[in-house]
Structures are given as C-alpha cells and as structure tokens.
UniProtKB/Swiss-Prot annotation:
UniProt protein name: Ribosome-recycling factor
An individual GO BP term: cytoplasmic translational termination
UniProt KW keywords: Cytoplasm, Protein biosynthesis
Subcellular location(s) per record: Cytoplasm
Segments of this protein annotated with the region Disordered: 137-159
Entry GO CC: cytosol
Entry function: Responsible for the release of ribosomes from messenger RNA at the termination of protein biosynthesis. May increase the efficiency of translation by recycling ribosomes from one round of translation to another.
Family statement drawn from the similarity comment of this UniProt entry: Belongs to the RRF family.
Amino acid sequence: MAKYDKADIERRMAGAVESLKSDLSGLRTGRANTSLLDPVVVEVYGAMMPLNQVATVNAPEPRMLAVQVWDKANVSAVEKGITKANLGLNPMTDGQTVRLPMPDLTEERRKELAKLAGQYAEKAKIAIRNVRRDGMEDLKADEKAKDISEDDRKRMEDEVQKLTDKYVAEADSAAEAKEKEIMTQ
C-alpha cells in the first residue's frame, strides 16, 4: 500500500498558507478591522473562550472597534482578555459595550508589526517544508516497499518540490503584501 498522497500533501501545504493568512489578518494596520480581535480569548464561566463566543465585534467607525458583550457580568473579563492579547489597544467601557479606538501606529510599532509578519511567514514556510519532508520520506518508503520504481520516485519528488516552491512563494507574497500595508498606512 503506497504511503505517498499528493492531494494530502497539497492540502497540508495550502493549510499552512491559509493559517498564515489568518495570522496576518490579525496584525493591526491603521484601520479598524474586526478580524484584529480573532486571537483574543476571554476567561468566562471558568473556561477560556474565543471573544466571538461571548460578544459581537463591529467597526462603527474607520478607526474604532466596538465589542458588544452579551452578558454584562463578562464585560471586565472581555476587557482583560483584550489587554492580555497585547494588541496595543486601550479598551474603554461604556455599559455593555467595550470601545477600542485605533491609535496611530508609530514608526517603531510599524517596524515591529512588519517583523512579526515576517516571523509568521517563516513559521508557515517551516510547516510547508515539513510537509515536503514527510512527502519525500513517504516516497522513499514506497520505493523501498517496491510500490514504485526509482524513476517514479524521482518524478514524484520533483512534483513535491514544485508544490513546495509554489506554496513558499504564496507565503512570501502574502507576508510582503501585509508588510507593505503596515508600512504605508
């Protein structure tokens, strides 16, 4: 039984790029974006929950996020979760609504965020290369088990390498676009 599965390898590489794009969407630029609060977790009812399970997030103004907490008892926990997420936001409470004005990004903070985007991209590229390594190992195991010939293994290794190059390039371009967005806002 052959271990190598090209579709699985491509799916896992695409997953790494999607994860990168999700991470990058959480990086703050100058504008209010509800996805900025996606990584925020809140300690409520004795458990850690994503913010979107205890409140609604919207952007009423271009430079303001509003978090409408469903249960008034959770307002302080939501504030604490936002502060702990270290997003550089200063929550202001107004009843059951937590308002988050978007401060202007300093040049120093822009550089930090651009560097963080690069780190996220590197993490994604490592994941892609790990998938590549798994695929190459599966091909060698298939050849050893006489499921495929040496020529087939080499041809399939080339396919895996092409997929790797494609997804690494996608990761690079996503990170470059985010870095450009951060530095020009």
